[in-house]
């Protein structure tokens, strides 16, 4: 009998983490959960530990760790609880771990994901901020360690599936003309512009096709999510920003396309369910059952496409500008967006002010060369401070 693949799931209580665990549980003959991590949903993390019996669990604070450890013992589990970023990095780099699902949302996921990279793991990357913030450094570390990097975003996984196996030689070398990154357009695609001032966090989080966490749902509504994915695609596939085009596709059936110089366009289709890209990346280069229902083309009936309106979605324009500027600009973009989205979810600002905060931060802070991780976090810290200053000036 072959050895079970040991899997660490960073961000286990989030939507991607839960979908990953669903796929893993379908294949007990292949995979075993090594570690689970959570941030705020401690009762959910406990339930996941009871179900999957990991070797380790990681939580952010010592008090939460003590409570969880007591609860695990009461449940008869030997799971050891670790604390903080050090614990995250430990379960990402442990010698027994084969695969790391990097699904922590935001900048907090960067260090543990890099720990997995440096340890040469197979990394299923859902944390887009890791590449957005430190793309050049991140990809350099991947090449140095020999880590296997597989995208979990449905769009990037679709691109990966449509690319030739030797795409790392360069897009022009393998005949790729451009990448077409699809977007649903979110819940406000047809909302009159004047009404965007009044939309609520709950409305922003009501995605028409996907079930996601609140932060990424707001990013989808503003199309910042697609802007971050554009930056991520540039690093994953060594593309220039002008080689990545965003296309609105409301049905979310085509997850992305690759346009070749001979006139061929390859697309990956499927029901909008994260378990498809997770299963693809988890078993690559093989295929396994994901639990996702087959796509019914007769029920889909039609596929629509339209160009994104940058007046409606200024965050997409800002992200493209950051991609073109490079260096510290994407890290600042991401940091300002995280602060702005948190303020919107707390009802401190209106929806259009998310883009206003980001644009002002990018205008105030000059782009600097990023040569190490310290410079990345310095840019992140400065941008967060400027965004908070904006809130202090403009929010009563």
Swiss-Prot record:
Binding site for 1-deoxy-D-xylulose 5-phosphate: 128, 154-155, 184, 207, 220, 225-226, 229
Catalytic activity: 2-C-methyl-D-erythritol 4-phosphate + NADP(+) = 1-deoxy-D-xylulose 5-phosphate + NADPH + H(+)
Annotated residues for binding of NADPH: 13-16, 127, 129, 213
GO molecular function, one term: 1-deoxy-D-xylulose-5-phosphate reductoisomerase activity
InterPro entries per record: DXP_reductoisomerase, DXP_reductoisomerase_C, DXP_reductoisomerase_N, DXPR_C, DXPR_C_sf, NAD(P)-bd_dom_sf
Keywords: Isoprene biosynthesis, Manganese, Metal-binding, NADP, Oxidoreductase
UniProt pathway: Isoprenoid biosynthesis; isopentenyl diphosphate biosynthesis via DXP pathway; isopentenyl diphosphate from 1-deoxy-D-xylulose 5-phosphate: step 1/6
Cofactors: Mg(2+); Mn(2+)
Lineage top rank: taxon: Bacteria
Binding of Mn(2+), residues: 153, 155, 229
Pfam families: DXP_redisom_C, DXP_reductoisom, DXPR_C
SUPFAM superfamilies: 1-deoxy-D-xylulose-5-phosphate reductoisomerase, C-terminal domain, Glyceraldehyde-3-phosphate dehydrogenase-like, C-terminal domain, NAD(P)-binding Rossmann-fold domains
Protein name, UniProt field: 1-deoxy-D-xylulose 5-phosphate reductoisomerase
Naturally occurring in which organism (per UniProt): Pseudomonas fluorescens (strain SBW25)
Gene name in the database record: dxr
